[in-house]
């Protein structure tokens, strides 16, 4: 039991560092605030504009609506919060704490620590998403394929990003709505330095030309922010630790 506990502690240490270190890096770069949860509501380093205000403007320009706009009813918020609380309490990482410690007191303490560190992850998640959205749009919007960052082509090569020039202007347009029909792209060749050919039909009712798999937001965030290679490697190690902890 002690061995299992220390193994889980080691896995979580790798996971939390892999998640927080890139978030702290990006928060410092964008807001000069080392705390991602606080940097989320701080001003940008290159201007006096608040990050949330910029995110609102970007979201509106792309057709998504203001990021901070309150759209849900009170009952919706209550149900979402209740689901999050019950789901967190039922996480295997929390429940297992009651079977790997010798006493009830230790079980309560262990579960308390588990919930504390899970809370840190939850508080950081919105900041990671906000940072990634801003950096993503600024790095690809209205850019030609040839001038897109290396990360765009790397993720395209494995099929998690796709682009199709709908309007023939040779520039990337990222907007709301699906880019293709069906939404998930199907490729028929490798990129070879050019956009991979997509067999899907373009979605005629939207201006969006880009497909980005939502599962890569956390993974690609360090690359999008142009962080050092060791940070990207740390994220990969964290993903492996998360997979092994299930």
Which role does the model predict for each range below?
Residues 234-238:
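Non-catalytic terminal/interface segments that mediate subunit docking, oligomerization
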Residues 13-233:
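Loop-to-helix junctions at membrane interfaces in multi-pass transport proteins
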Residues 88, 130, 239-242, 246:
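Gly/Ser/Thr-rich helix-start
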Residues 1-12, 94-104, 240, 244:
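Membrane-water interface regions at transmembrane-helix termini and the short interhelical loops
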């Amino acid at each position: 039991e002690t061995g299992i506990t220390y193994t889980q502690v080691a896995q979580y240490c790798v996971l939390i560092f892999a998640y927080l270190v890139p978030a702290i890096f990006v928060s410092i770069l964008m807001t000069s605030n080392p705390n991602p949860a606080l940097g989320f509501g701080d001003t940008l380093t290159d201007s006096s504009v608040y990050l949330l205000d910029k995110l609102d403007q970007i979201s509106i320009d792309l057709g998504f609506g203001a990021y901070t706009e309150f759209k849900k009813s009170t009952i919706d918020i209550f149900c979402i919060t209740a689901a999050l609380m019950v789901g967190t309490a039922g996480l295997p990482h929390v429940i297992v704490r009651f079977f790997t410690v010798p006493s009830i007191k230790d079980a309560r303490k262990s579960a308390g620590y588990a919930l504390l560190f899970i809370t840190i992850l939850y508080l950081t998640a919105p900041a990671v998403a906000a940072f990634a959205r801003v950096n993503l749009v600024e790095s690809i919007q209205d850019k030609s394929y040839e001038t897109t960052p290396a990360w765009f082509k790397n993720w395209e090569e494995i099929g998690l990003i796709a682009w199709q020039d709908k309007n023939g202007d040779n520039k990337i347009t990222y907007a709301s709505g699906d880019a293709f029909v069906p939404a998930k792209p199907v490729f028929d060749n490798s990129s070879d330095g050019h956009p991979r050919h997509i067999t899907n039909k373009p979605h005629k009712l939207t201006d969006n030309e880009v497909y980005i798999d939502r599962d890569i937001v956390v993974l690609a965030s360090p690359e999008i922010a142009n962080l050092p290679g060791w940070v990207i490697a740390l994220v990969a190690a964290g993903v492996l630790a998360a997979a092994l902890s299930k």
